[in-house]
UniProtKB/Swiss-Prot annotation:
Family note: Belongs to the bacterial ribosomal protein bL34 family.
GO cellular-component term (any): ribonucleoprotein complex
PROSITE patterns: RIBOSOMAL_L34
Name of the featured protein: Large ribosomal subunit protein bL34
Record keywords: Ribonucleoprotein, Ribosomal protein
GO molecular function: structural constituent of ribosome
Length: 44
């Protein structure tokens, strides 16, 4: 049986990276929320 998590840095960056977050309004909202919370890392 194939497992659900098949790590790939390329897919990780494309789906959850900073540029992907900035591309949508909802993504920018996530970044702002993480900044407000004082997160050390904002995105993958």
């Amino acid at each position: 049986m194939k497992r659900t998590y098949q790590p790939s840095n390329l897919v990780r960056k494309r789906r959850h990276g900073f540029r992907a977050r900035m591309a949508t309004k909802a993504g920018r909202k996530i970044l702002n929320a993480r900044r407000a919370r004082g997160r050390k890392s904002l995105s993958a």
